[in-house]
Amino acid sequence: MRIKGTGKSETIVGTDSADLIDGGAGNDTIIGGAGTDTLTGGRGADTFVFCANSQYDVVTDFNPAEGDRVLLDLGGSPSTPAYSGTLWDGLSFQTAGGTCTVHCVDFNGDGVMDTQLSINGNNMFLLGCLPSQLHGWDIMGG
């Protein structure tokens, strides 16, 4: 299903199917849902919510310089960092919802390394973003 934001700051929630979500402009919160989703925040400081049941999400335009961040929805406090420090390839840390691992992979074969977050067998890929570009304050909720 294609879901398009209005260009204002909003919360956009996907379905249990495979969704293509585009937040457009604005500081959006994007929750893919249980399906295999492609998430694009657009301009603004966007928050991409990664749940333990998210299955498989790909974020196409993650940009920490714009203020983008990932929220791990695992039952912890969304204002508390799930991990404090710089992320790196092979890092593993425990959260309330399970173990989160960080990997550096070329997900789409374009020759650019991407970040893979894995929780309990579910994956989120941040295209064009290295783990070293993320810090603990970018990964919230634990």
Annotated model-derived regions:
Residues 45-142:
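Acidic glycine/aspartate-rich repeat arrays in secreted/surface proteins
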